Amino acid sequence: MSNQQYWDEVYETKARDAVSWYAPRLSTSVSLIQRVTAANKSAPIIDIGAGQATLVDELLADGFSDLSALDISGEAIAKSKHRLGPAHERVGWYCADITTASLPANRFDVWHDRAVFHFLTLAPHRECYVAQARDAVRPGGHVVLATFGPDGPLQCSGLPVVRYDSTQLAAVFKDAFELTDSALENHTTPAGKTQQFLYAVLRRL
């Protein structure tokens, strides 16, 4: 089964509020995006691994006008478009694997990723991811990234993950980005379990 087939099956068979990473609002992500854009509502923003999360909904409601979303699952994108209704036309959609996606160069001020990067357990895939972010984010722009923290789970959705502290994450991105901020946050899953996330802000050099 390919990665795309795997994630299509996840989004076909599980309710949006039943997956472990579900949160009714992505308040930390929105707050960090507001901060790094200095509330510039025309800042180009892309959400990597958008899934069925409500980040684009929240950013649209907050007045941001240049939004894109990427996910490997066409099923997730279709459901997000349905949820948004006519507003989905105000978002640019990419159905692709982030390690091989074709993205415009120097296009984005903000690259947001909540819970994709930690699934990249092989170094070549991480290197492709960093290269994609380097090429797509404008110098001075930011990556807002959330991964499992050092005490986070070892698996998610049945797949292995890599846990990070801020020093480890900074080292992975060091050739093109500098870490400017990080914080640990506990996420409560729909099943009531606690998962530790690391939120990091990295500035494009």
Per-range role (PLM):
Residues D109:
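Conserved acidic residues
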Residues A115-F119:
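Short catalytic micro-motifs in class I SAM-dependent methyltransferases
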Residues M1-N106, L120-A136, H142-L205:
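Class I (Rossmann-like) S-adenosyl-L-methionine-dependent methyltransferase catalytic domain
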Residues H112:
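A conserved beta-strand element that flanks and buttresses the S-adenosyl-L-methionine
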